A protein has these predicted regions:
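Conserved structured core elements
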Residues: 52, 63, 180, 184, ...
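A general structural signal for short secondary-structure junctions and capping/turn motifs
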Residues: 48, 59-61, 131, 176, ...
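Surface-exposed, non-catalytic interaction/assembly patches
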Residues: 2-46, 113, 235, 269-341, ...
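Polar, S/T/G-rich
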Residues: 1-255, 262, 308, 315, ...
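Acidic, low-complexity/disordered segments
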Residues: 286, 386-442
């Protein structure tokens, strides 16, 4: 838990390096950056080294905007900095030109230093001993990458005319727009050729990604009297020195996503309450059933989630479920013989307390309904997808239409299929309306 908080706090500091990996920002985050240039210039006819020049790289581009710049945790618009700064922001387009401020510095920075594809701040500061004690820490609020939405592309299988936009095109990034929708961000990461997997559009099921995006747009009231808000947003800083698998897992966890791979094509599904799509009985189950019960190692009665909270300017925060002293806590502890079973989870894509709390709740509830089984069935199971809900009716375990969720589908050499199934309870996805409003200091 401490490491998670340290990692999040580390995103707000400035580093100096010419080999530091450049992160990717999806959604909205406050970040520091990497100083790739620190130089000075004498004032004309004045003091030596009076002007300090900084080039602070923030993330991969092209991002939507860079705003609300702070120096040493104080807004740059504060009167204490009046007359002491000039800056330019560059959102990281592939066609951006050089910054004229930086060419003033005694550093060899020229008009060929364009940092195309990189979002950065060019800053000039005038020395004032009453204001600065050294090189200030700079942070900025970044509205991250512009992403493609297949629902807004009239040529896409995922097109949704009800959204009123038809002009986006996957092959034309200038038509893309900023979004915090997890499905669209995951699709962007999978298709990006510079820092992602570089998948062609034909390898992505845009009908599925569009449906998942619509699922992520569903709103709920986080507490009594609260306004409707989305339960799934993506506000993440991904590290490009982490593996593709690690980053995709981070993104999926924040939206309860599955990423099935069928016949060479990736799709996305959001884990939610679903209807049963297929029933398995002795007529299509071949052989016996292998059953694995829940294990104490993976069963919890308390989940702590670490996240960067937008309500406190993206500082590290935590959410816990169930609440201390609650009926749920007492019930779970009684069922577990009074033993506290705790899991600490880092949620890098989340910036909202209520969302973090609800994800903790779903993870905990699933851990307590974690019966698994494996069955061999007839080839009709090939029509299923990971995330589908099925029922199993079989006399051996005395199951009558017991619901399960498909975790894995394997085609066997003899034409049959093997399914890995997880016990399914649709009630766990209903938002916990007992949440109370949390207040934060200004």
């Amino acid at each position: 838990a401490k490491k998670a908080a340290d990692d999040m706090a580390g995103l707000l500091i400035n580093k100096e390096s010419n080999i530091e990996p450049i992160p990717i920002i999806y959604g909205v985050r406050r970040v520091g950056g990497v100083r790739v240039l620190v130089s000075t210039r004498d004032a004309s006819g004045g003091d030596p080294n009076e002007y300090l020049y900084i080039c602070l790289v923030l993330c991969e581009g092209d991002v939507h905007s860079i705003t609300d710049i702070h120096l040493d945790d104080i807004a740059i618009t504060n009167s204490k900095y009046s007359g002491l700064y000039s800056f330019n922001v560059h959102t990281g387009s592939d066609s951006q030109t050089y910054d004229s401020l930086l060419t003033e510095a005694n550093s060899g920075w020229t008009n060929t230093h364009r940092l195309r594809g990189v979002a950065y701040i060019a800053m000039r500061l005038k020395w004032d001993a009453d204001v600065f004690s050294g090189v200030p820490e700079i942070t900025a609020l970044v509205n991250g990458r512009k992403v493609y939405d297949p629902r807004k592309d009239s040529t896409s299988a995922g097109y949704d005319s009800s959204l009123g936009v038809s002009s986006q095109r996957f092959a034309t990034p200038s038509t893309w727009t900023f979004s915090v929708n997890p499905s669209l961000c995951i699709r962007d990461y999978l298709s990006n050729t510079r820092f992602g997997k570089g998948l062609a559009g034909t390898k992505l099921d845009d009908s599925a990604f569009g449906s998942a995006a619509t699922d992520c747009d569903v709103t709920t009231s986080f507490y009594s009297g609260g306004s409707a808000s989305k339960l799934f947003d993506m506000n993440a800083v991904l590290q490009t020195d982490d593996t593709l698998f690690e980053n995709v897992q981070i993104m999926l966890m924040g939206c309860r996503g599955f990423l099935p791979y069928n016949q060479g094509v990736y799709s996305l599904r959001i884990d939610k309450s679903r209807s049963v799509v297929y029933a398995f009985t002795v007529d299509n189950i071949i052989g016996g059933i292998s059953i694995t019960g829940e294990s104490k190692e993976n069963k919890f009665n308390r989940i702590n989630v670490k996240f960067a909270n937008s309500a406190i300017d993206y500082q590290p925060d935590s959410a816990t479920w169930p609440d201390a002293g609650s009926t749920e806590e007492s019930t779970f502890l009684a069922e577990d013989g009074g033993t506290l079973l705790v899991s600490d989870i880092e949620l890098p894509t989340c910036s909202n307390y209520y969302v973090a709390r609800d994800i903790a709740r779903v993870i905990l509830r699933r851990s307590r309904n974690a019966l698994r089984c494996s069955i061999q069935v007839t080839s009709e199971a090939l029509q299923l997808s990971v995330g589908d809900v099925v029922t199993v009716n079989h006399p051996t375990p005395a199951w009558g239409d017991k619901p399960f969720q498909v975790e894995e589908i394997t085609l066997n050499y003899d034409g049959t299929c093997s399914l890995a199934l997880l016990e399914y309870d649709s009630s766990i996805y209903t938002y916990d309306t007992s949440a109370v409003e949390t207040t934060y200091p200004d």
